[in-house]
Amino acid sequence: MLYPEQNEARLKLSLDGTWAFALGSCVEDQFDPAKPLPDAQPIAVPASYNDQNDQTTALRRHYGWAWYQRKVTLPTFCAGQRVVLRFGSVTHTAKVWLNGQLIAQHKGGFTPFEADVTALLRPGETVLLTVACDNRVNHSTLPVGNEDGQLAFFGSDNAGIPSVEAAKRAAAPQNRPNFDFFNYAGIHRPVVLYTTPKEYIEDVTVVPAVDGTVQYAVKTTGSAPVHVTVLDADGNAVASAEGTEGTITIPEVHLWEPRPGTPYLYTLHITCGADVYDQTFGVRSIEVRGTQVLLNGKPLYFKGFCKHEDFTAHGRGFDPVLNVKDVNLIHWANANAVRTSHYPYAEEFYDLCDREGILVMDETPAVGIGGGAAVNPYKEYPLAEHHRQVLAEMIHRDKNHPCVVLWSLGNEPDLEHFPQDAYDYWHPLYELAHQLDPQNRPVTLVCCQNDYTKDITTRTMDIVCINRYYGWYNLSGDMDAACYGLNQELDFWAEQHKPVMMSEYGADTVAGLHTAGAEMFSEEFQVEFYRRLDAEFDKRPWFVGEFVWNFADYDTVQGPMRVDGNKKGLFTRDRRPKLGMHFLRQRWSEIPTFGFKE
């Protein structure tokens, strides 16, 4: 599925704006999609619906289906064209109707889906577009939610007290996420109608090599001849070829590198009969060799942020202004990488990272797989098929982005209590990722704080990625003990003879809270936390990167462990730097992207 673009052969019409909206229930087809929604209110698209109306808590606490509706008119000048309706993402399960006819269904809230509506939407005609989305998370969704009667992440219930148990049975149904971020829902990314000629370019794959050779494959629906031209950054043609697949050689090739290097981009200009499509790409290599990660043959050190798509009012909704601001703050911080915790981000963000030279660890929404020793998720949760689906959709969508240098299969599953079952679940996904990716990028799985000696899965990944909270959730506030514990664990990982990086670590920090000593939750403690742990990373030549948790404060489910969300951000939710960010900015200014541990 190609990203929609507008050119001399294709038209793209935005359907973003204000739609009609109504909350439903857990009944799947509660409303008639051929009729106007009852008691509809206005809602903005794209955006989460949860925080758009503070006159009521109903949107914030909604559990079940929510309904969107608007009218759509196709211009008469689209006659003779193929017409496609595309959604960037709808969270988590979606159904779409035109004039009451079901045209699309999709499970998974973070990747695009589309439907050919040529036969249903005639030029000059106005139709009723209805979308229903289900925000419920459970043991069959990714991310995972707990079933009724179980706790949400960081919840509390004093289990066993009769009055509490009775109240739980009487309580209204609600989402109980097994993850530490708010379960925002709705039409989160752009909605477009786009056109193509009847015979069209369906897919493009580009596999460049640093010697300038570029393998390409173009999938089309007709028999029209295919012509491809490589354009340099100035739009000059530098190579060309004929046919749906082949190899092109770029003379005097410019490589793509993260800043402060040059993120040089080429364009593969494709024509097929009346259709035209432009696919940008960068020429770079990424590989693991021994205990090093090599980009263009040079040892790489990741200086990165874990992020969330999260902001006030629009929740997880697509925001190009915020994306640009965040990328500029990443540059300001002297960082070079982002981890898309814990789901694939909007496609436009990857385009920006391509242009701006920011490395991306691209992660599936597989977070929350595990419930402790009492539950074997690999035997009891029906997740494997859906997991393969979301992994395939992510890789297919993002395969041509030079910024993407690492696939993450998921975040913090239970790898300790059922180690063989965990390996049997995750290793086929590891193999599938390598099979699906034409560029064969490294693959990892982000593991949580556990008995790492029992974890037989993480050590099999191309890069060992560990989430650790020494000094915060473990050995809280005692940084001497935290460093001792960290070093003992790092000695274990050294024996695996693989590159290792910290994929998540951090400390909740209340902006403006200062203490004479470095006390927990203060800005001073955040500085001390990073200063002490980072010094230990620097002693290990096989330690190849650090992704701090988190770029900015973000919203979570309410509970006794969270006060207005997670405060581990280096920036506040409105993007003001904390003291710890100034420390990291200085640290990262002294660490080169290449050759740091040589």
Task: Give the positions of each predicted feature.
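Short low-complexity, flexible loop/linker segments enriched in glycine and/or proline
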Residues: 145-146, 352-356, 375-380, 384-387, ...
